[in-house]
Amino acid sequence: MAKKGKEVLNALDAAKTQMYHFTAIVIAGMGFFTDAYDLFSISLVTKLLGRIYYHVDSSKKPGTLPPNVAAAVNGVAFCGTLAGQLFFGWLGDKLGRKKVYGITLMLMVLCSLGSGLSFGHSANGVMATLCFFRFWLGFGIGGDYPLSATIMSEYANKKTRGAFIAAVFAMQGFGILAGGIVSLIVSSTFDHAFKAPTYEVDPVGSTVPQADYVWRIVLMFGAIPALLTYYWRMKMPETARYTALVARNTKQAASDMSKVLQVDLIAEEEAQSNSNSSNPNFTFGLFTREFARRHGLHLLGTTTTWFLLDIAYYSSNLFQKDIYTAIGWIPAAETMNAIHEVFTVSKAQTLIALCGTVPGYWFTVAFIDILGRFFIQLMGFIFMTIFMFALAIPYDHWRHRENRIGFLIMYSLTMFFANFGPNATTFVVPAEIFPARLRSTCHGISAASGKAGAIVGAFGFLYAAQSSDSEKTDAGYPPGIGVRNSLLMLACVNFLGIVFTLLVPESKGKSLEEISREDEEQSGGDTVVEMTVANSGRKVPV
């Protein structure tokens, strides 16, 4: 690596933790706060949408979204997210992280508002408009994954880099919690202001006209935190690593870094001949043998583990309400009015978020640079597997009223170890182990693989969790394999996560250039290197 360029990057790695590091966490993290709020808040209002738009006169049960509509409403944002992760991940490497960072946020703001303003002449028309806006909302959310992770990894020092990236991702927990709290406040306010009988007393009167405002307000609220951080995102300079390693402008990199971090460094413009173009192997692209040789197993590890994790994680999160209903923790729908049902579902999800989801994220932040990424991910998958089997095998035991608290504790622990485990580490590792010129792209590919898993979870679990008894299925659904067997399947998915975690290298305590071998590339070396995974002595070829 050219001397001046290496000085800039070494200064970043050695920089003390400063106020701007925390500012960057908040700026990037508020995007993830919004991401989680928008992606998970829909699960709080889907039952209300069914009551409002798909009520059937003389039916003994409140209206529910038809299977295809429910699948679309729950899953379309993930389809957009997958596309956004691939597109903006690639664009972040081509144009720079900063240039496209504001676009993703504005998409989130506009489409959050659009979701709440969905319209149509018929029920299906309203749902189609909602799905349109939620697809593009997901597209913006998708871009935030690779860009936020890459920006934070390239700003951070090597000592606390894992904690900084994990802290950005941990804002998801607050987003999920905020979704539940906002929904609680809105539904409680409307429930007290517009009294309504239960469905079994008055099927039509149980859904007051004002209920249509509840879901719209909940969805539109997601625009506020994103809008508040737009200005600060636009003020962030390009990362020094992108400017020095990809744009090849060391002088600008040093200048940008000095503006935000307390590091005095003067760099001169470097000749192009000093760049890593001296050896063709060191300018390899994504679809080359050289990339496959150096990083193929790494990319396979990050994509498969994120895919498997999101099948279990998103199916569990999106359909908490169905699991709670199945074990009897949430009363039968006909015993509540429409708005009170939103309140009840929100209360359950908020409790789980408070007890399991949020603490898990911040345990990762606290321990990731101590225990390492590999250990935390492996531990998380192991405990998720154990708790899923513990929920599924004695499932009938948990359905008894006196055992419901035990079920909720086990379920909370599953969510805890998902977040103090692979849900955080699958986000952190791809931002560290790939070269700067491909870092955002590879993170986008890994994240898109995760969202493919989320789509499988969102669409598959919706049908699979239906009772095998056709008389007990929700309206319009074919018989499924039941909640118990669905939980068994998720436990097996988590076990596969343990296996594929063995392909993921440890990146704790190393500089980004050391992990990705860019320091070797820049110096023109051609040494075969191995990366030690965790502290086990096991090595993965790179």
Curated annotation (Swiss-Prot):
PROSITE patterns: MFS
Extracellular side: 46-70, 121-131, 183-211, 316-350, 395-404, 465-485
Topology within the bilayer: Multi-pass membrane protein
Presence of the UniProt keyword Transmembrane helix in the record: yes
NCBIfam families with a match to the protein in the record: 2A0109 (TIGR00887)
Family statement drawn from the similarity comment of this UniProt entry: Belongs to the major facilitator superfamily. Phosphate:H(+) symporter (TC 2.A.1.9) family.
Protein name stated in the entry: Probable inorganic phosphate transporter 1-5
Organism encoding this protein: Arabidopsis thaliana
Lineage: Eukaryota, Viridiplantae, Streptophyta, Embryophyta, Tracheophyta
The encoding gene: PHT1-5
